[in-house]
Amino acid sequence: MKKTESKVSLFIALIAIIIFASVPLWHFDLNANRPQTQVVKKKKPKKKKKVVHKVTWGYPFKRLYEKKIKFKSGQKFGETDIIRRYYPTKSYFHDGYDFGFSEVGHSTVYAVHAGTVHKVKYAPGLGLYVWVISDDGYVEIYQEGFLSITDIYVKKGQKIKLGQKIGRLTGSHIHLGITKTDKKYIDKHGVPCRYYWKDNGTWLNPMKIIEDDIAK
């Protein structure tokens, strides 16, 4: 009887050991069948680089930065109230912009755009002028404002930067003309004034070009 009880007790003990030993396995198996939840780290959005516009045009006089000047019709580009040509047909077209002594004084003239001085010369109607050709195809003519060659600070072949001193206004006004190298702006005498009387796209509005660039 005692032997039988011992065998029963031993059997029960073995069963208990097997049960307890299997618990971790069951736990493992249950976890193995469960879907795994993966934590995904959100990527921080890349900061967009702000594109800063590099100004490449500027006013020919510092005073224009300081205050708004109201120019007269005759000083502005385009059709004006002043006749420019009588024969063979009348024309009121102005091929540039005039900056007068009354607005800017006898002050320093600054380069409105970078480029290379093509010529410093005299021509009837233009007076002493500075002819600049820029790498991007623009052409700038500073004319009618220099009474003496000593009023001009640059020379032929010189590379100039935006805002560099061109000379000094000593006349009544500086006429600034802007065109492009692909335009037929040179007359038969080699002077950069062809179609000065005609609004055919040869000459461009200087103030629009300058102020559009500054405003970007």
Region locations from a protein language model:
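Acidic surface patches and DE-rich sequence motifs
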Residues: 71, 123, 134, 187, ...
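Acidic, glycine-rich catalytic/binding loops that coordinate metals and/or anionic ligands
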Residues: 53-55, 62, 152-161, 178-216
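Short acidic/polar mixed-charge low-complexity motifs
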Residues: 105, 136-139, 202
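Short glycine/proline-centered loop/turn elements that form peptide/ligand docking sites
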Residues: 153-154, 165, 170-174
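Short, solvent-exposed loop/turn positions at domain surfaces
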Residues: 103-105, 148, 154
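Sec-dependent N-terminal signal peptides
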Residues: 3-28
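Surface-exposed, glycine-biased beta-strand/turn segments
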Residues: 30-128, 161-162, 171, 204-216
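Zn2+-dependent peptidoglycan hydrolase active-site motif and core
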Residues: 111-151, 173-180
